[in-house]
Design a protein with these regions (language model features):
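Ligand-recognition surfaces built from glycine- and aromatic
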Residues: 151-175
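Secretory/extracellular carbohydrate-interaction modules
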Residues: 40-102
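Short, solvent-exposed beta-strand-to-loop segments that form ligand-recognition rims
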Residues: 139-153
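Short, aromatic/His-centered strand-loop micro-motif at the edge of beta-sheets
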Residues: 101-122
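Single conserved hydrophobic/aromatic residue that forms the stacking wall/gate
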Residues: 1-10
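Beta-strand-rich interaction surfaces with strong enrichment in secreted/lumenal proteins
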Residues: 45-50, 109-116, 145
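Short tryptophan-centered beta-strand motifs in secreted/extracellular beta-sheet-rich domains
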Residues: 58-60, 119-136
Length: 175
């Protein structure tokens, strides 16, 4: 059941001595309501029509572009969000769930050094109501985070400090 998370639905393989992980192909059988953007312009904070929800398979691909900071805010509304912010100059991806609804004293910010020397090119998110799985650069790195955000917070916002273009592929996951 997806409400328990997707920890057992990874396909693992070894590449160059490292474990890479991806969601299993079978997840595609639950894909509904596709929404696709090719070269969507992001300049400042941007929302894309049809890109929202809390149970989905969302892939964002970035070409080499002139930006310093790119961010995706998931499970978002006026009060809540979980932000995934890439700082291109340092190669750091910051996962910030400060505003995800956490009420206890927990670590809310994690930082990941992107392993690929070419930087962050692709992010695939699997959202499952109260958790987010992120597959970085086709599974070279993986991050999981729990979110306590009310289920009504289903917005997705993109941000870039300079004009850039992304490709977005989104499917609702319906069991």
């Amino acid at each position: 059941e997806m409400s328990r998370g997707l920890g057992d639905v990874y396909k693992r393989q070894v590449k160059d001595g490292q474990i890479w992980q991806q969601p299993v192909r079978e997840i595609a059988q639950y894909h509904k309501n596709p929404c696709h953007y090719e070269h969507a312009e992001i300049d400042g904070e941007t929302a894309l029509s049809g890109i929202c929800g809390r149970t989905m398979d969302l892939t964002v691909t970035m070409d080499e572009q002139d930006f310093n900071v790119f961010s995706i805010q998931l499970a978002a509304d006026e009060e809540y969000e979980t932000a995934f912010t890439y700082h291109k100059g340092t190669g750091i991806l910051e996962i910030d769930r400060t505003y995800c609804g956490v009420t206890k004293d927990v670590v809310c910010v994690r930082k990941i050094k992107i392993a690929d020397p070419k930087g962050l090119k692709k992010m695939r998110f699997i959202l499952d109501r109260q958790s987010i799985e992120l597959f970085i650069n086709d599974g070279q790195q993986v991050a999981t985070t729990a979110v306590c955000t009310p289920l009504e917070a289903e917005g997705i916002r993109f941000f870039s400090d300079k004009k850039m273009y992304i490709t977005v592929e989104k499917y609702d996951i319906v069991l």
